[in-house]
Structure formats: structure tokens, C-alpha cells
Amino acid sequence: MRKLSYLLLFLALLPLGTFAQKKSSFEIKNGDFYLNGKATPIYSGEMHYSRIPHQYWRHRFQMMKAMGLNAVATYVFWNWHEQEQGKWDFEGDKDLAEYIKIAGEEGLMVILRPGPYVCAEWEFGGYPWWLQNIEGMEIRRDNEQFLKYTKLYIERLFKEVGHLQCTKGGPIIMIQCENEFGSYVAQRTDISLEQHRAYNAKIKQQLIDAGFDVPMFTSDGSWLFEGGSTPNALPTANGESNIENLKRVVNKYHNNQGPYMVAEFYSGWLSHWAEPSPQTDASSLARQTEEYLKNDVSFNFYMVHGGTNFGFTSGANYDKKRDIQPDLTSYDYNAPISEAGWATAKYDSIRNVMKKYVKDIPAVPSAMPVIEIPSIKLDKVADVLGYSSLIKPILGDNPKTFEELNQGYGYVLYSRHFKHPISGTLAINGLRDYAVIYIDGEK
């Protein structure tokens, strides 16, 4: 009986949060964002869990708080979690729930951007490679097969993070429906606007059916709201520096009222191989930040901290002159927090502006320690092509794609042996990656 009394006393002394998190409310109403009934602007920074080792997540969140921000936004990368069909991975660097929990512990609200298409200069825009092997599949449209798999993805995502919505006591306050869909609508004029809207509505409904119940929003260029906006979701503008134009276009698609938000406030820009790295100055970024603050415009720095495209995750852009523009392994983005996690001149400039509008900004945390790596001497080499004879070939008259070979990432060796001398020009049409060509062993 005494043991039972001790147990009851122990239970009584435990904080309530040990068993149940306190629910909160986040609403979009009367032209404002409201957190627990109080008008609350959003000062957010984009940071992707997949581009930062999990050991550094907390430090980066602390850097954001010390910059004056109150929220973090992140995409969810479907192909980061389901690299093989039906095999899900949410461990280690892929532990999205842990990422969100740590953000909440550090006093940040969380904005979730699950796509399913995310762009983000990420491989296949976040789609798993194996989707292309499914018969009848047409991605990013009102297609039965595609929607079958997006439903499975969204339901699995909810299983991981649904309990972390503010309505359940977590830090997630908003969720984005699709991603910059207006750009896709503008490019795919072969598909009717009605069909585009039907697809967009079904993605939103899948999010609702899965159990996501926090406010929804869309993000597009301000000139693309016609194709990208969807009913009962706040339209936000990407890269819009003209505040009058921002308010005009949001009013048009949101019952003539705000709140007004720039969901992608570009702090820098992406970098392509063999091109100069884009640079923007700190002073102009700080000035635009203050313009938003003075005019009650919420914002999300894209990116506040870019990180790294590990492995084969970096994507590419398309350009008519150069066909393909592959992105770098580095996703530094010339952002306020460098790829290494250090404060930059942009960071300091923005922090000084934010101090005028945000009370009690904490001190900037110390930089993470670095290590010295001694010189590494390589004394052995191996000819990769020399081992090709040990691999059983797949024969055919025409080369197969990676997907047809059931290979999501890495390298494929395509070879052709000619029995007689030939001459002419080698043309490779439709190449979607980097190719290294050898003729008789010569590069």
C-alpha cells in the first residue's frame, strides 16, 4: 500500500506535459494570423531537414531565434523517405518528427510544405523515381494512378507528424497545398484549367482526409494566382517586393483581405555547375525586410540556411540554350546562415533590423567547432571501366532509362561495340543528366 501511495504521489508531481501536450489554436481570420486568439505575424525562415545532419538541427534553430524569427518552414521530400516503393525511412537525418519537435522546443512555430511536388532544386522535385515505372502514371495531374500514390504518401506523412499539429499540442501551424502550382499551370497549357484545378483540389482533400486540420495556404508568383490558388487556402506570394501589388493580388483571391505573406522571400539564389555563384548584398536584403515589417507583411526567408545536397539529391533547371542546368552539391544559397552554420553579414544586418520589432531576441549561439583534417595521400587507383566485365550486362537494341533498369541513383554504363569502322557525329537527344563518353577507352 505504501508503494502505491508513493506511486500516486509521483504521478501527481509530474508535469502535465509529460502525458498530454497543451493544445493551441492558430487561425487565419479578419485579415490576420491569430495564435491562441492573439494577432501574431509570421517571421519565418526556410530550412530543410534533409540538407542538414540531424546533430546540427538544434544549433540552427537557435541561430534562427537569435536572428529574431519565430517560425521555420520546411518542405517534405517524398523521395527522401520512400526511395524504394513501400519501404519508408524516418530515422536519423530523415526523422522529420524529431526535427519538428526540436523546433518547438526552441520556441519556433513550424510551417509544413509537403508538396507532393516541392521543386527546391531537389532531384525529381521530391517525387520517387519509381513512379515512372508504374503503368498509366501521369504525374502532377488528375490521374488515378498518381493520386493513388500521393494518397499513400500523405497518409504515411500524417502518421509521422499529424500529432505535431498545434491542434494536437505541437508546433505545426500551417500546411501548404501543392507548391507553386500556378507556374505548372502556366507551362502546361495542353491541360485545361478545369483539369488543373480538379487535381489541386484533390491534393488538398487528401491532406484533409488524412487528418491535417491546421490552416492551409498556397504559394505562387503574384502573377500566377489564377492557376495556383485554391478555395479555403490563403494565397501567398513568392518573391514579391512590391507591397501594394502583394495586397492587391491577395485581396483579389482572398475575400478582399489579408493576411499578407511572402512565403518565399529570397535571401540569395541557387547555383548551377559552370556558372557564376549569384550574390546579393546584405543592405538591400535588410531594407526589404524592414519594408515588410513596417507594413505588417509576414515573410519566410528562402533560404535562411541552405545546407548541402547530399548524395544524388541535387536537382536541375532547364534552359533552352544549355538544355540542362545541374545544381551544385552545395546549397549554401548565399543565405544569412552559411552552409557551415555560421552567421554572415546578411545575418547581422537582418538581426539588427529585427531588434526594432521583436522583443528579447536571444544572443547569437557560438559557432559549432570545426576539426582539422590532415593531408590525405592516395597511392592506389582503380579503373572503373576495367571491372565492367564482372557485371552481367542487360542487352538490347536501345538503351534503357535508369528507371527501366530499376536503378534510382548512381551510374549506368552504356556501351556499344562496332565490328567495322564508322564515322559521323554522335547525337544524344533528351539527355537528363551528366554523361561521360569514352571512345576506344579515350575520354
What are the roles of these predicted feature ranges?
Residues 1-22:
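Bacterial Sec-dependent N-terminal signal peptides
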Residues 19-71, 101:
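N-terminal carbohydrate-binding accessory modules
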Residues 46-48, 75, 178, 305:
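Conserved residues at the C-terminal ends of beta-strands
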Residues 75-76, 112-116, 218-220, 301-306, ...:
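Glycine-rich, histidine-containing beta strand-loop boundary motifs that form or position
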Residues 112, 116-149, 155-300:
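Substrate-binding/catalytic cleft of secreted carbohydrate-active enzymes
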